[in-house]
UniProtKB/Swiss-Prot annotation:
The keyword Ubl conjugation applies. Its EC number is 3.4.19.12. It comes from Homo sapiens (Human). Residues 226-237 have a biased composition (Polar residues). This is Ubiquitin carboxyl-terminal hydrolase 15. The gene is USP15. Residues 2-223 are annotated as: Mediates interaction with SART3. Keywords: Acetylation, Cytoplasm, Host-virus interaction, Hydrolase, Mitochondrion, Nucleus, Phosphoprotein, Protease, Thiol protease, Ubl conjugation, Ubl conjugation pathway. The active site is at C298, H891. It catalyses: Thiol-dependent hydrolysis of ester, thioester, amide, peptide and isopeptide bonds formed by the C-terminal Gly of ubiquitin (a 76-residue protein attached to proteins as an intracellular targeting signal).
Length: 981
């Protein structure tokens, strides 16, 4: 066992490694741990092989578990938004959490962040830790201004919520109550089933719940309510009565809605139980219907508005054509549930009766079949669109039994033949309204770099994901700590290559500061310690936006100077009485620093160098302290000297107390007496002889350099928790030889301060003070826009596959980094274009805010079609999904063109407003919907002639000439663009 009764480090490492592999089980409790603390713990216990050299090193001791980085300020349980598993936090089962707390305790004032495991999915069940709880606003019917916020798990029941509300508002147990959902415009819906979970009930983030108490005369303040279905009852908490009397009580209620100027109760049909218009607004323009935000569901609202304003798809659902094609038996589908739910929603939105609807039932259905969308976290609009298009396709697939098809390579055959074959094969398994409207065909060409094997395939697509020209640079904020100890750190903003290394950062900082790049050391400081000390060749991608990057000036040549060593130094405050079960009796404070010192040094010289390095914020009293004696420290003579830290290296306490007066030394400052704190040459001022840092009589005997007291003691740490014997025996790292202290690159130094001395002499405000360089105010110049066609050209540019995504060459029988080229063969009636604005890496997430200039009308795609029979292929924009904000979060809206009046509108959740074309092109544009011009004929026209299906899209040969189709506008199509009809 380790110190304080904690398990030894090998046991800790083994236990936690095993518990991290624990399977999730519904109902279990797991705990969040800040990933930065956990990484520090991994270093301390040597969890990973590359951290073994730091195992047991007190300089990387993690201290109490600190989850403050996960929490919003001032709230012990409210998590910051958009935290990501493993990047921001680690999940531990209860046993693992309890072990860590027993070994390290939890930071004072913090509470455990416990979360339940919930089950998600309808057919394919899987468990997930519910990191973000659902925040509900609770109030009483008689006083809705007094709102209390509480957080619940999606696994909690309505009964659990009701009990909590009763407790909050001190409602007696015998008092009969019932619960209501309160929506916008004072619209209410009763919660009927006490055993329903929050997830089943579809309660969303920020939902207002109202508890209503029954009047003394037996009536309800809100009046009676209508059950959803025969036999259903409103959720009420009643005194103990028989089931029969309970049934009679509700059966005697009037089946009517109660409405007044303040509220209305809805009728309970499929959507009407929660979809409302504002009172008095029942004659809306069809399609101009907003969607209520259920809590971070703007991504869904934006996607739905774009699909809703896709004329051929909406006409298909409004005309009930979907009912004939529902596929309930498709194993890849959702038993028709997604299609039916979407159809009901579209009918509500286009009924002209509502100014907005609440898509709660649709959201619930999506979450059942796609658990990643079941919560109320911000999601990607394009990812939801991909799911909806695929889900609708499978629910409406006209193919009831999919045949097995052997895919063939081109093997030198003409593109026209291979394309026709590929499209026919696709239609044998996939034939739906989604295929009719959204599917196109592209050509993929792979070339092996070894044997020159060429592989050509034709593959269908539902949308185009277009890359944007990547930003080649990023800005980083760093703090430069100069050698001059009197100079405050300075904050800089540097522009560095996005795919660069630490040397690039130093070079950029050198241009601003004048300090040579080779005289810089870049570090990441976290929780008062060095989290990382970077090598010059490390990638900048490992630096995240939230990291505190400090760059230290070191005036030595690290490759040639053999006389000096760079030592990391951290500051610790001693505890007089530690209540921690496993702690060294100290806690870190202040900012650590790096300094270069001679390899051969005396303890006294090192102490003096350290004191001078901190002279800006360590204030020495100028009053003589007769009772303690004095140690004189020259205020200025050792600053800006010839040493690697801007100070002289020759001074020692005895040398500095010279009898030869000068103008500088006459300003001597006094330190307290050292007689109580002198160090033996073996202990180096360590903790081994006295827990409070004071030497015993034996260790101090014969080692006094005068009646002087030091402000701090210091302790060296290397591969482990260094003790006296280790220092004496292991001459590879630290040793004494004729009272000389030997150091090397593996040495770490901790300065231990007595709390009283720290309070008296250490100025924390001065230590944390810094200045700002003018570069901090730098704003990058406006980036020039790119055209949509530039993105399409980039999409069709030849590229080399990455090492992590090779292609298996059938000739070489090996995976190769082949060259790949994509080309467009045929395009669908509605072209969905996804602008790839978000980029991901192991350490960084980023959003590209490049302005893409896309045409509203007359997007000519003909030049990008390699089909030799392709003719004119022009598109008009019909909808745009917008994303405002950064990578971690933001807001989605939509622009869409109404199919009935041909005007543009702006959809922002429940709000709908008119828009002009000059508003549409912006940096926020994320997903574009284009409809081909030859599919417009009147209002929402789209031909669905089942007789014309075949390989025409693949071949590019029109089924009939324009002259043949003059008699029937419904047959006009440019088959060179269209793939099936």
């Amino acid at each position: 066992m380790a110190e304080g009764g904690a398990a030894d480090l090998d046991t800790q490492r083994s236990d936690i490694a095993t518990l991290l592999k624990t399977s999730l089980r519904k109902g279990d409790t797991w705990y969040l741990v800040d990933s930065r603390w956990f990484k520090q713990w991994k270093k301390y216990v040597g969890f990973d092989s590359w951290d073994k050299y730091q195992m047991g090193d007190q300089n990387v001791y993690p201290g109490p578990i600190d989850n403050s980085g996960l929490l919003k300020d001032g709230d012990a349980q409210s998590l910051k938004e958009h935290l990501i598993d493993e990047l921001d936090y680690i999940l531990l089962p209860t046993e693992g959490w309890n072990k860590l707390v027993s070994w390290y305790t939890l930071m004072e004032g913090q509470e455990p962040i416990a979360r339940k495991v919930v089950e998600q999915g309808m057919f394919v069940k899987h468990c997930k830790v519910e990191v973000y709880l659902t925040e509900l606003k609770l109030c009483e019917n008689g006083n809705m201004n007094n709102v209390v916020t509480r957080r619940f798990s999606k696994a909690d029941t309505i009964d659990t919520i009701e009990k909590e509300i009763r407790k909050i508002f001190s409602i007696p147990d015998e008092k009969e109550t019932r619960l209501w959902n309160k929506y916008m415009s004072n619209t209410f819906e009763p919660l009927n089933k006490p055993d329903s979970t929050i997830q089943d009930a579809g309660l969303y983030q920020g939902q207002v719940l109202v508890i209503e108490q029954k009047n003394e005369d037996g009536t309800w303040p809100r009046g009676p309510s209508t059950p959803k279905s025969p036999g259903a009852s409103n959720f009420s908490t009643l005194p103990k009565i028989s089931p029969s009397s309970l049934s009679n009580n509700y059966n005697n209620m009037n089946n009517r809605n109660v409405k007044n100027s303040n509220y209305c109760l809805p009728s309970y049909t499929a959507y009407k139980n929660y979809d409302y218009s504002e009172p008095g607004r029942n004659n809306e323009q069809p399609g101009l219907c907003g969607l209520s935000n259920l809590g971070n569901t703007c991504f869904m609202n934006s996607a739905i508005q774009c699909l809703s304003n896709t004329p051929p798809l909406t006409e298909y659902f409004l005309n009930d054509k979907y009912q004939e094609e529902l596929n309930f038996d498709n194993p890849l589908g959702m038993r028709g549930e997604i299609a039916k739910s979407y159809a009901e929603l579209i009918k509500q939105m286009w009924s002209g009766k509502f100014s907005y609807v609440t898509p709660r039932a649709f959201k619930t259905q999506v979450g059942r079949f796609a658990p990643q969308f079941s919560g109320y976290q911000q999601q990607d609009c394009q990812e939801l669109l991909a799911f909806l298009l695929d889900g609708l396709h499978e629910d409406l697939n006209r193919i009831r039994k999919k045949p097995y098809i052997q895919l063939k390579d081109a093997d030198g055959r003409p593109d026209k033949v291979v394309a026709e074959e590929a499209w026919e094969n696709h239609l044998k398994r996939n034939d739906s309204i989604i295929v009719d409207i959204f599917h196109g065909l592209f050509k993929s060409t792979l070339v092996c770099p070894e044997c020159a094997k060429i592989s050509v395939t034709f593959d269908p697509f539902c949308y185009l994901t277009l890359p944007l020209p990547m930003k080649k640079e990023r800005t980083l904020e760093v703090y430069l700590v100069r050698m001059d100890p009197l100079t405050k750190p300075m904050q800089y903003k540097v522009v560095v290559p996005k795919i660069g290394n630490i040397l690039d950062l130093c070079t950029a900082l050198s241009a601003l500061s004048g300090i040579p790049a080779d005289k810089m050391i870049v570090t990441d400081i976290y929780n008062h310690r060095f989290h990382r000390i970077f090598a010059m060749d490390e990638n900048l991608s490992s630096i995240m936006e939230r990291d505190d990057i400090y760059v230290f000036e070191i005036n030595i040549n690290r490759t040639e100077d053999t006389e000096h060593v760079i030592i990391p130094v951290c500051l610790r405050e001693k505890f007089r009485h530690s209540s921690y079960t496993h702690h060294t009796g100290s806690s870190l404070f202040g900012q650590p620093f790096l300094m270069a010192v001679p390899r051969n040094n005396t303890e006294d010289k090192l102490y003096n160098l350290l004191l001078l390095r901190m002279c800006r914020y360590v204030k020495i009293s100028t009053e003589t302290e007769e009772t303690e004696g004095s140690l004189h420290c020259c205020k200025d003579q050792n600053i800006n000297g010839n040493g690697p830290n801007g100070i002289h290296e020759e001074g020692s306490p005895s040398e500095m107390e010279t009898d030869e007066p000068d103008d500088e030394s006459s300003q001597d400052q006094e330190l307290p007496s050292e007689n109580e704190n002198s160090q033996s040459e073996d202990s180096v001022g360590g903790d081994n002889d006295s827990e409070n840092g004071l030497c015993t009589e034996d260790t101090c005997k014969g080692q006094l350099t005068g009646h002087k007291k030091r402000l701090f003691t210091f302790q060296f740490n290397n591969l482990g928790n260094t003790d006296i014997n280790y220092i004496k025996d292991d001459t590879r790292h630290i040793r004494f030889d004729d009272r000389q202290l030997r150091l090397d690159e593996r040495s770490f130094l901790a300065l231990d301060w007595d709390p009283d001395l720290k309070k008296r002499y250490f100025d924390e405000n001065a230590a944390e003070d810094f200045e700002k360089h003018e570069s901090v105010e730098y704003k990058p110049p406006k980036k020039p826009f790119v055209k949509l066609k530039d993105c399409i050209e980039l999409f069709t540019t030849k590229e080399k596959l990455g090492a992590e995504d090779p292609w298996y060459c059938p000739n070489c029988k090996e995976h190769q980094q082949a060259t790949k080229k994509l080309d467009l063969w045929s395009l669908p009636p509605v072209l969905v274009v996804h602008l790839k604005r978000f980029s991901y890496s192991r350490y960084m997430r980023d959003k590209l805010d490049t302005l893409v200039d896309f045409p509203i009308n007359d997007l000519d795609m003909s030049e990008f079609l390699i089909n030799p029979n392709a003719g004119p292929c022009r598109y008009n924009l019909i909808a745009v999904s917008n994303h405002y904000g950064g990578m971690g979060g933001g807001h989605y809206t939509a622009f869409a063109k109404n199919k009935d009046d041909g005007k543009w509108y702006y959809f922002d959740d429940s709000s709908v407003s008119t828009a002009s074309e000059d508003q549409i092109v912006s940096k926020a544009a994320y997903v574009l919907f284009y409809q081909r011009q030859d599919t417009f004929s009147g209002t929402g026209f789209f031909p669905l002639d089942r007789e014309t299906k075949g390989a025409s899209a693949a071949t590019g040969i029109p089924l009939e000439s324009d002259e043949d189709s003059n008699d029937n506008d419904n047959d006009i199509e440019n088959e060179n663009c269209m793939h099936t009809n």
